[in-house]
Amino acid sequence: MSLRLTSSLNQNKTTNVNGAISRCLWRTETRCSTGYGSKSGFAEEVGRKKLEIGRLELKWERKLDSLDLFVRRKFEKILFPNGNKSSRKKANLDKNRNIATKVANRFELSLNQPVHFSQTNPKSTPEPPCTSSSGAGDCHENLPADGYPIENDDGMGEPARMLGKIKKPRSRLECIFCKDSHTRSIVNCPNIRKISDRTNILIVQGRKIDNTEKQRKAKKTDVRVGRKFDALRNFIERNIEEVARDEPISEQKVNHRSEFSEQIIFGDYERGPTFLTGNLVSSGLSTFTMDSEVSNDSFGIPGTMPSPKYLVSPISNPTFSNKKTRLIRQCHQLHSRNCAYFVEMSIFQ
């Protein structure tokens, strides 16, 4: 066996482990001997490596032993939760063994389930079609349309389509708008069309809005804010101190004309609006007329929109110095005290 050694002076020296060193190798401290002796730097290096390897082997052997012991103890706790003692009751032992047998049988059954070749390995050759007892057709007569056996039902309405795994249903939330579980967010609700291209509007579900989720939805629905919407934003910013003093702003100050009027309120950004039935005038909040291309049927609400009834936030004295504010267009239906469906206008974003 040949080893290529390196030294501080000569970088490439080929020697034989079992024979004598052909040339003297210089080390940093002392000069080695010409023979394979105990004082040889090469022998010292070999001994040091062997000792290091031995320590590593011992270290990993201890790790494997401890891992094996850990796994054994885990299995014992699962199979024998009351301890592996002679005083353990026979009933508990039989019960645990029965449970372990059922688990093993179920796992074995899941491994033996028939799977189509097209879903596991497309290059595999499928089995030749067999003949049923009637003389024609596929031998699997009781298979449903997708080819999976009915007995392989995981109890969740769908057959288990993966080996060794039970397919779990996707976690879905009920859409507040149409009471359907078609999506986790009402943004994709088929009953809601895109509201307007001239305003930057976010449709959000829930009171608390995650910042990253809001940014993601804003990026999808973010459009350039139109000229009229900018005018409305500037108008609100100019009159923000008057709103904070609970002095209602008369509608004559709004110089915009629109067929679609909305009542816009201020809510607390951190806590979220507390939805209660009320009146904008009694709450000390103002009524604005928003210029937008939003029509009454843009939300997909069947029928005509009723008279303006909104869920308002009873904020008697809102402050805008310490807390971030937002404008919220409330749900058009007075159906719930804790309505979580609202459209947020990112005016102060």
Curated annotation (Swiss-Prot):
Q: Where is this region: Disordered?
A: 116-148
Residue ranges annotated as compositionally biased, kind Polar residues, are 116-135
Q: Spell out the protein name for this chain.
A: Uncharacterized protein T16H12.1
